[in-house]
Design a protein with these regions (language model features):
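Anion-binding alpha/beta catalytic cores of soluble intermediary-metabolism enzymes, centered on
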Residues: 1-82, 89-205
């Protein structure tokens, strides 16, 4: 909706918590539709917007890893050819254009390496592939009561002519006004907005 209202061709969702920064090729679509959303044009847009965001955050030479769509990056075509026919050539073109991009990296190892600091960001192919690792680290629940104890993480929309960040959780209207809301995600969202704004100002000076 924000892309439509601001007149841009497309936007990208980036989730962030600590050094876990994950942008997405697709988000709210059925799994059966994900392969159709993975096109060279869309993947390159996600790579470019992610790289731009990292530069604005003060990372001089961003390193971005691209997650594989299929198990074991397709296992040489045994489990699908999208990683071979779409992702690999797009990554190669980005590298030829001077970007530091690697992949496709199998989805079962890419986020371990991201958390360890081997990459500055990762590109996930679909919603749950990117959301699960970020929320696994940013969300904590009380095992006895099932209540959320910590909700950390930021949802950032890339590609807009404005800076847009938000908390990485729902509206929680059920606890509004009770004095028990967790503020961590909101503070992170404000911090990211400030840092992105500073990056924009620096690029224009």
């Amino acid at each position: 909706m924000l892309a439509h209202l601001t007149g841009v061709r497309g936007s990208v969702m980036l989730l962030a918590h600590g050094n876990m920064r994950v942008s997405h090729v697709s988000t709210h679509v059925a799994l059966e539709d994900v392969p159709k959303r993975l096109t060279p044009e869309r993947l390159r847009m996600v790579i470019d917007l992610t790289n731009d965001a990292l530069l604005r955050l003060g990372i001089a030479r961003p390193k971005i890893a691209i997650a594989a769509l299929n198990p074991h990056a397709g296992e040489g075509g045994l489990f699908g050819r999208q990683d071979i026919d779409v992702s690999a050539p797009t990554i190669a073109k980005a590298v030829a254009d001077g970007l530091d991009v690697v992949g496709p990296v199998p989805g079962d190892t890419i986020f371990v390496k991201l958390r360890a600091g081997q990459y500055d960001a990762a590109v996930a192919m679909y919603h749950d592939q990117g959301h699960i690792p970020v929320k696994l680290l940013g969300f904590q629940v009380d095992p006895a009561t099932g209540r959320w104890q910590e909700l950390s993480g930021v949802n950032i929309t890339l590609g807009l002519p404005i800076i847009r960040t938000s908390v990485d959780h729902g509206t929680a209207f059920d606890i509004a006004g009770k004095g028990i809301a967790n503020e961590h995600s909101l503070i992170e969202a404000i911090d990211y907005a400030e840092r992105l704004s500073a990056g924009v100002s620096a690029s224009k000076s």
